[in-house]
Amino acid sequence: DRDEIPTFQSVILASVYDIRNIRRKLRPDEEHRENSPWNIAADFLVDMSFSASEIGGMLKEYENDYHTGMDISMIAHLLYDYTSGYPYLVSRLCYFMDERLSDTDAFSDRKSTWTKKGVLAAVKMLLDENNPLLDSLTHKLNQFPELEKVISKLLFQGQTIAYDPDDVAVRNARMFGFVKVENSTVQIANRIFETRLYNRFLLNDVEQNNIIYAEGARQKNQFVINGYLNVKLILEKFVETFDYLYGDRAETFIEDEGRRFFMLFLKPIINGVGNCYVEPQTRNRERMDLVIDYNAQQYICELKIWHGNAYNERGEEQLSSYLDYFHLKKGYMLSFNFNKKKKIGVKEIRLGDKTLVEAVV
């Protein structure tokens, strides 16, 4: 007698590739691209990302085994802030902390590793490595130059990208999880991807030959004291350099390029030790809050286009509340002011229990 063995009647493939893209790999000819018997797949409407609470649950299990004394809620939310719950990125950061950072000169044991400083060190390792996911992100930008252009405008100018489901480049970027759609606009999917993209744009050969990048590199040694960034001095030197190089340029040039030029000036100063990114909820044509991660410390600098004193005061209040989120007492502002009577320079003001360093160029 034959044994009866149950067999599957159907197979579900859950993947970042939809069935049409698998078919393109097998049959790339253009004339049959959309009319194909392969177009039979149903949407797999399952959110594969982790929530902060789900990350916390995994950390709790780890803590039960290793007793690190970590602040589970804080670490879980920090991991989520950088990854938006992208499973591979969450796993990779935790791997770095568990396997690569613990028992090193910087982190003597697991207790010292599972801290905010340890998470930021793991983020730095992830951004510096080559892995298939981040390599694929770069490949997609090379494959779709138009996508690269619109993402550059999003990152540096705060330009809104309306979601168009017929845009092949954006559609593919969304399918691979590199971008997401919120309120019918395209956003970078998470902070890790965004920081990697900033590094790509700021460290390419063209930008490294930019004169303001060269000025940042030439002056970099004076900006770090005992491992800490002197952001006030960075702003002072940037104001001097920018005014000298571009002070007579047209308003539209400064509005479009000013914030990118500050990041270009900053990048050689922090490169190798730190990174920077923009909080997406603050990004628009008028302002964006730049977060600088440097040597496990964080600095917040609002980059904005000047629109009068009342707008400036609201910006100060917004920055003050944002500092509360990061548990910081000092913040920085850089305003690109088109008023001919403006006073160029840097000053400090007190706002409640916080100090704001304001630079005007």
Where are these predicted regions, by residue range?
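Conserved catalytic cores of phosphodiester-cleaving nucleases, focusing on short active-site segments
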Residues: 262, 290-292, 296-307, 322
